[in-house]
């Protein structure tokens, strides 16, 4: 499952271990019990979520492949209860792939220049920076040094492996109007995948544990 984000980004589900019933099994092992019928299993998930018994959800694990601007990735990496591997600018020649916000992104802000000119200025700076990057590499400058001229809207790619408990914490903080708009878009994509793979857990999360706002306002 792959969802396109922004102008060139994406979130792709690479792997998932477990589902709603994984949390049920983990919770009932305390009483040396397993699965019951669907109604009672689903009720247990709601009970766990309502009363903050979150460790059973750590037995559901997702791996995502993400392509995002560096400034989004740096916010993302603050969520530390997870595993990350990122594209290396030391060992790889970085591609000309930059996030250019549309003029509509600036609607509602009191800028002294038109939004279209903002987009043009960003594009001009990106072009100059990337040309300089290539010139430095062609001059023999190592990639690890040449890359420092590139701006934060350069796209990077990384793998993110995270359990459902930490994923829900990510959604609480990033699927929220206080987060930057760009990372909100990625959080919505993560929520959509989470809902598809763990519908009972997602529904209980929204009902009892979600602290943000935008997931209750949009259809994921």
Curated annotation (Swiss-Prot):
User: Residues in the active site?
Assistant: 174
One example of a Gene Ontology biological process annotation: methylation
Required cofactor(s): FAD
Q: In which pathway does it act?
A: Pyrimidine metabolism; dTTP biosynthesis
Q: What InterPro entries does the entry give?
A: Thymidylate_synthase_ThyX, Thymidylate_synthase_ThyX_sf
Q: What does this protein do?
A: Catalyzes the reductive methylation of 2'-deoxyuridine-5'-monophosphate (dUMP) to 2'-deoxythymidine-5'-monophosphate (dTMP) while utilizing 5,10-methylenetetrahydrofolate (mTHF) as the methyl donor, and NADPH and FADH(2) as the reductant.
Official protein name in the record: Flavin-dependent thymidylate synthase
Upper taxonomic lineage: Bacteria, Thermotogati, Thermotogota, Thermotogae, Thermotogales
């Amino acid at each position: 499952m792959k969802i396109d984000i922004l102008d060139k980004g994406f979130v792709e589900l690479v792997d998932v271990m477990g589902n709603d019933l994984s949390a049920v099994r983990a919770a009932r092992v305390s009483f040396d019990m397993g699965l019951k019928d669907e109604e009672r299993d689903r009720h247990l998930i709601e009970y766990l979520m309502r009363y903050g018994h979150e460790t059973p959800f750590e037995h559901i694990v997702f791996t995502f492949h993400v392509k995002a601007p560096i400034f989004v990735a740096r916010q993302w990496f603050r969520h530390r209860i997870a595993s990350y591997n990122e594209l290396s600018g030391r060992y790889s020649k970085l591609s000309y792939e930059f996030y250019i916000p549309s003029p509509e992104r600036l609607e509602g802000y009191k800028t002294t220049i038109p939004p279209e000119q903002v987009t043009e200025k960003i594009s001009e700076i990106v072009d100059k920076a990337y040309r300089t990057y290539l010139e430095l590499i062609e001059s023999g400058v190592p990639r690890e040094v040449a890359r420092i001229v590139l701006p934060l809207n350069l796209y990077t790619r990384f793998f993110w492996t995270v359990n459902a408990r930490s994923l829900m914490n990510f959604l609480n903080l990033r699927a929220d109007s206080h987060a930057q708009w760009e990372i909100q878009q990625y959080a919505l994509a993560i929520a959509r995948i989470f809902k598809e793979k763990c519908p009972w857990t997602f529904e209980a999360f929204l009902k009892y544990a979600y602290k943000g706002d935008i997931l209750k306002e949009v259809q994921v």
